[in-house]
Design a protein with these regions (language model features):
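Beta-strand acidic-aromatic groove motif in beta-rich domains, primarily in extracellular
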Residues: 86-90, 117-127, 164, 365-376
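Solvent-exposed, low-complexity, repeat-rich "mucin-like" stalks and linkers
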Residues: 194-238
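Low-complexity "stalk/linker" and mucin-like segments enriched in Ser/Thr/Pro/Ala/Gly
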Residues: 229-253
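Short carbohydrate-recognition loop motifs
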Residues: 63-87, 316-340
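Bacterial Sec-dependent N-terminal signal peptides
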Residues: 16-53, 189, 193-198, 279-287
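Extracellular/lumenal carbohydrate-interaction signature centered on repeated Trp-anchored short motifs
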Residues: 86-108, 141-143, 344-355, 392-395
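Extracellular beta-strand ligand-recognition surfaces/modules
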Residues: 110, 148-188, 357, 370-373, ...
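Extracellular carbohydrate recognition and processing domains
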Residues: 129-161, 378-412
Length: 438
């Protein structure tokens, strides 16, 4: 589980001096302007320029002089159990207001151990509401032995004034709390880190607008030969475009310029690429009067219904992600076989005649690819189909599907999109999901 999902609702800013009152070590909040390239975060004591912001339980972090990797003192993290009213997980970020020049280092390293086998999320670059150069490793395995963790920095030349030094996040194991210890947190230059690459990524393009890439998956080869997987900001890289007249990229924003065709973005500082497979038109703008519509997903109407848009039902392989192309929102379904779109609250369709949905097939096809669209009343064992239609899809073109609803339709609980036997495509785009009456 990715515990940072809870940061926005559990973030608690702590006055550092009072927070550590009575602890063995204190963080000095005076900014150390004379050492902008300081490598230490925690080496028996906190670096003098650091401040701390707790996530989850505010009192989860302290220091310990008994259990340590080396020296005299370690950081002690008390991970609470899920029922702790003060906070049901432990996390925090160490930062400096002045920023540090980290361009001479290529890794953040630390040692960690735990009272129980668990996993930890950790990284750097978490500062403020809009981190610029974040790097995260999830699923770090922790046990009763001290183990060194290496968090590679994909392109440290960008970090000339970085403020986010180190963050961690951990949750309960088997509904129980436990203790973590972290020690020797510092930035290093490790000469045997090599072969930085981004995971190849494909996406749809649109005639105009900006598309923001929030994160990339990357890999860096560690001294032990393992390719360490990291989640990182695209801003670490400078990308070149194979067709700049069609699309360009600046930091983490792709801008489309109106042309059509394939575009490949390659980073100068790493291997791998981001490929825009084609430029697609936007879905047709709906023309129904809003008074006759109950909308789930459309930029034309007020969406009074809501859904996570993927029920992750048994045996499905379908993933989903939303594309925001200059304010136009489109849902992408990949590795598609079928997907359930379960409504957060049932839709009263007693006065509605049709379910509408626009679908675009991204795969090349022989012209014989179909999709089944269904509306269901009830769920689980009590599900009943109240509307169904099989439609032939067209590569690169939007197909509008209008599914007649049964005359006795009352509350619609879920929708289902399914690839019938004989069809073999993988990727579709979906827009304008709503119910309407004539």
């Amino acid at each position: 589980m990715n515990y940072r999902n809870y940061i926005s609702v559990n973030l608690v800013t702590i006055a550092v001096a009072s927070y550590f009152m009575g602890c063995t070590r204190e963080i000095n909040t005076d900014v150390l302007a004379t050492s902008p390239n300081l490598s230490e975060v925690f080496m028996d004591a906190f670096a003098p320029d650091l401040q701390f912001q707790a996530w989850g339980k505010p009192t989860n972090m302290s220091t310990d002089t008994e259990t340590r990797y080396s020296g005299t003192t370690s950081m002690r993290i008390a991970v609470p159990d899920p029922t702790d009213l003060a906070g049901n997980w432990a996390g925090g970020t160490f930062y400096t207001e002045a920023g540090r020049n980290l361009s001479g280092y290529n890794a953040l390293t630390f040692y960690v151990k735990s009272t129980v086998p668990t996993t930890l999320e950790a990284g750097l670059g978490s500062y403020g509401d809009n981190p610029q150069y974040s790097v995260t490793i999830s699923g770090i395995k922790v046990d009763a032995n001290w183990n060194k963790v290496i968090i590679p920095i994909p392109n440290s030349a960008k970090l000339t004034a970085e403020k986010g030094m180190f963050f961690y996040s951990a949750g309960a194991v088997d509904n129980s709390g436990y203790t973590l210890w972290i020690d020797e947190v510092k930035f290093e230059y490790i000469g045997t880190l090599a072969h930085t690459r981004i995971e190849n990524m494909t996406m749809a393009g649109f005639p105009s607008g900006d598309f923001e890439i929030s994160t990339l998956i990357g890999y860096v080869n560690l001294p032990n030969g393992i390719d360490q997987k990291i989640t990182m900001s695209p801003k670490y890289f400078t990308f070149e475009s194979s067709n700049p007249e069609i699309a360009t990229i600046n930091e983490n924003v792709i801008t489309f310029h109106g042309g059509k065709g394939k575009v490949v973005f390659t980073p100068k500082e790493a291997q791998g690429s981001i490929t825009v497979t084609d430029i697609y038109d936007f879905a047709p703008v709906p023309t129904h009067n809003e008074a006759n519509v109950i909308s789930l997903y459309s930029d034309k109407y007020i969406n009074t219904l809501s859904s996570p848009f993927n029920g992750y039902w048994d045996w499905q392989t379908t993933s989903n992600n939303e594309i925001n192309a200059g304010g136009d929102h489109i849902m992408h379904y990949g590795t598609f076989n079928y997907v359930g779109i379960v409504l957060d609250n049932d839709a009263d369709c007693s006065d509605m005649d049709y379910l509408h949905i626009d679908i675009l097939l991204m795969d090349e096809s022989d012209g014989n690819q179909q999709i089944t669209v269904e509306a269901h009343q009830g769920g689980g064992d009590a599900v009943a189909t109240v509307g169904q239609k099989v439609t032939t899809l067209k590569t690169g073109e939007w197909v509008s599907v209008d599914v007649p609803l049964d005359a006795n339709t009352n509350l619609v609980h879920e929708l289902m999109l399914q690839r019938p036997d004989g069809s073999n495509y993988q990727d579709i785009l979906v827009d304008n999901i709503y119910f309407y009456k004539n």
